Design a protein with these regions (language model features):
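Bacterial N-terminal signal peptides that target proteins for export
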Residues: 2-11
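Short linear capping/connector segments at secondary-structure termini
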Residues: 33-37, 177-184
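Outer-membrane beta-barrel proteins
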Residues: 121, 213-224, 237, 326
Length: 330
C-alpha cells in the first residue's frame, strides 16, 4: 500500500512538471476565430434586418415592462388626470403628486410606482439601432432605391417613437442622430421644439416611403399607417392642427380603418363557470385571436408577442383593474 501511494505521488509530480514545462507565453496568445466589425455586419441586408428586428423588439419592450405589476404604457395615464394605478395592494403609487412626485419618482425601475424608466433606457436603445440602420443603409449595394427608402422610413419611425416619448416626458434632452463611435461625456440638451421639428420632417419621409399594410406580406413591423398615426401626434405637438386633421382623415378614409361596431372574428367564450360571457364587440376586440386578423379594422399596427418569439409578460389587468379585495382603496 505504501509503495502504491509513493507511485501515485510520483506520477502526480511528473504530470505537474510536464504541464508547467509545456505552458509557454504563446499558449496565452489570443486566437479569435472572427472579429465583430460593424462595417462588415451592417453593410449587408441581413445585417440591416437584424438591426431593424432590434428596433421592433425595442418598441415592444418600451411599452411592456413585464415585471408582473406595472406597465410603461399604463404609466403614461398614471401621470395624468385620466387614471390611477389600479394595483391598490402595492402600498405605494402615484396618487398624491403634491407630496409624492419628484423628478425621479419611480425611475429606479422594477418597482410599483411607475415604469417611466422604460421610456428612457429602452428609448435610447431603439434610437441607437435606428441610427445604425440610417448610418449604414446607403452602403448596402444590393438594395434598390425603393427598398433603401423603406429601411430609412422604418428607422425614422423607430427613432421618432423613442424621441416622441422622451421629449414629452423629460423635456429638453440630447439629440443623437448618428452612431456614437467613441466615449462621449459632453452631451448637451436640445430643445423639445427643435426635436419635434426633426421628427415631423423624418416622419413625412416615412409616410411617403414605407408601404401600407395591404402591400406588406407580413404583420408586426412598421407600416405606412403607423407612420401616419405618429406623424399626426407630432403635428399636434407642433401646433399644426390642420395637417393633423388632414392626415387623420386620409388615414381613416383611405386605409380601411374604422371603429368596430359589431362582434367579429373568433368567439372565445372564456370560463363560463367564473363569468358567463354574452358576446359583444368589446369582448371580441380584446381577444388575442382577433387582434391581427383582417376583419379587425381598428388595428393600425399590431405588436406581436408569442412565447416562441421574445415573449414579454403583459400584465395589463394587474395595472389597470382595481384590486377590490384590498383595504387600501377604502
Amino acid at each position: 500500500m505504501k509503495k502504491m501511494n509513493k507511485l501515485v505521488r510520483g506520477c502526480m509530480v511528473l504530470v505537474s512538471a510536464a504541464m508547467l514545462a509545456s505552458c509557454s507565453d504563446s499558449f496565452l496568445e489570443q486566437d479569435p476565430l472572427s472579429f465583430y466589425n460593424p462595417g462588415n455586419t451592417y453593410t449587408t441586408e441581413s445585417g440591416l434586418r437584424s438591426a431593424m428586428a432590434m428596433c421592433d423588439l425595442g418598441l415592444k419592450e418600451m411599452l411592456m415592462d413585464g415585471n408582473g405589476n406595472v406597465l410603461p404604457i399604463a404609466s403614461l395615464y398614471f401621470m395624468t388626470d385620466i387614471g390611477l394605478y389600479a394595483k391598490t395592494d402595492a402600498g405605494f403609487f402615484m396618487d398624491d403628486f403634491a407630496n409624492k412626485i419628484t423628478p425621479t419618482s419611480g425611475m429606479k425601475g422594477g418597482g410599483d410606482e411607475n415604469a417611466m424608466s422604460r421610456f428612457w433606457d429602452r428609448g435610447w436603445t431603439s434610437i441607437k439601432f435606428a441610427n445604425t440602420v440610417l448610418s449604414y443603409v446607403d452602403q448596402v449595394q444590393s438594395l434598390d432605391e425603393k427598398v433603401r427608402n423603406e429601411y430609412k422610413g422604418r428607422a425614422y419611425f423607430h427613432r421618432a417613437y423613442g424621441y416622441y416619448h422622451q421629449a414629452l416626458l423629460f423635456g429638453d434632452i440630447p439629440l443623437v442622430t448618428k452612431i456614437i463611435e467613441v466615449p462621449k461625456q459632453n452631451y448637451k440638451s436640445t430643445s423639445k421644439e427643435a426635436i419635434f421639428q426633426m421628427l415631423v420632417h423624418d416622419l413625412e419621409f416615412a409616410v411617403q416611403n414605407v408601404p401600407a399594410q395591404k402591400d406588406m406580406p407580413y404583420m408586426g413591423t412598421v407600416n405606412q399607417e403607423a407612420c401616419m398615426q405618429l406623424l399626426i401626434k407630432c403635428y399636434l405637438v407642433t401646433g399644426e392642427y390642420k395637417k393633423a386633421e388632414d392626415m387623420a382623415t386620409d388615414l381613416i378614409n383611405n386605409h380601411g380603418l374604422k371603429l368596430m361596431d359589431a362582434p367579429f372574428g373568433s368567439l372565445v367564450t372564456g370560463n363560463s363557470t367564473t363569468w358567463p360571457v354574452e358576446r359583444n364587440v368589446v369582448w371580441d376586440l380584446h381577444r388575442g385571436e382577433n387582434v391581427s386578423i383582417a376583419e379587425n379594422k381598428e388595428t393600425i399596427m399590431p405588436i406581436l408577442n408569442f412565447h416562441s418569439q421574445s415573449w414579454i409578460n403583459y400584465p395589463l389587468m394587474r395595472a389597470m383593474c382595481v384590486h377590490w379585495s384590498n383595504s387600501v382603496i377604502m
